[in-house]
Amino acid sequence: MVDKRRPPSPRARYIGSQIYRGRPDARIVSSPRHAPNRYIDRPRAETMSFELHLQPPGPEARAVALKELRETEENVKQGILELKKYLEEDKTIYYKTDDDFLLIFLRPCKFYAKSAYDLMKRVAEFKEKNSSLFDNLMPADEKSAILENNVVNVLNGTDHKGRRVLLVNCGKTWDPSRVSADQILRLFYLVHEIAMLEPETQIFGTVVIMDFEALAMKQVLGFTRAFSMKLLTFIQDAMPLRLKEIHIVKQPFLFTMVWQMFKPFVREKLKKRMFFHGSKMASLHTHIPPSHLPKNYGGDLPEIDYTSADWYPTLIKNENKIKEWNSYGFRKEQ
């Protein structure tokens, strides 16, 4: 929230389309409803249609960026200059170098240019190693998986901390004979390509809710060791988004078999961000309040399905951005 008693800093200026200030005009303000989290309450998701929020970060986001990401005018300018230099010197990889695009990689790396450059190389390596899954991947390639198979959805709005929420149904509605685990990974990839375009999502990050209700052996067998390694490599090494939390809900005893497959590849940093709630929605609500969850998870919002009809048009609308992303990575030999 901006302190209106003070005039705007004369040092305020734009870098790309983002505004930065010489002093932190924004600060996090306690909310009576979410005082423990110290974040301003946000509109309930049901009041928002699914659309990308591409405007520059607001006061709350700028305050979080300053506190958590070292996002000062000086660090932004220096990070962009250094990252451009790394990319100019490396002739093996290709990414565009406009300021706003580079922020996608600098923000999760707290504006350390070398770390952002290393992330760009890992993204290129992941795409090359899994080219059969991701080369020229477009939304239409997975239209049926998205619209007809009730596996992946994205909440229309954000949660109370401004984070995008991805919902994955790995239980009763997932038929591995119709949508493979690798296809689920392709859906994740398409969603992340769009989510990372939002400046505030770059700052606030994302949350994943994985629903294992009525998990059966056909779903357990749908997960493979190879898939678990690919998924965790993507999440931990090659995703330029801040993954803040993963919530496992409604998991039966059979889930132990799935977890044993993934557990060896989960690093300590990710383990600390994973929460296992079972059927106790009150446990989930300590992280995301009912006001920002659908009825499926003890929330106040209407019950949802997983057809993804709300956000598929957003993918189609931004196909040009997805095509651009497909062109990035290691340069192809002529």
PLM segments and residue spans:
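Basic, amphipathic alpha-helical/coil surface patches used to engage anionic, phosphate-bearing ligands
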Residues: 2-334
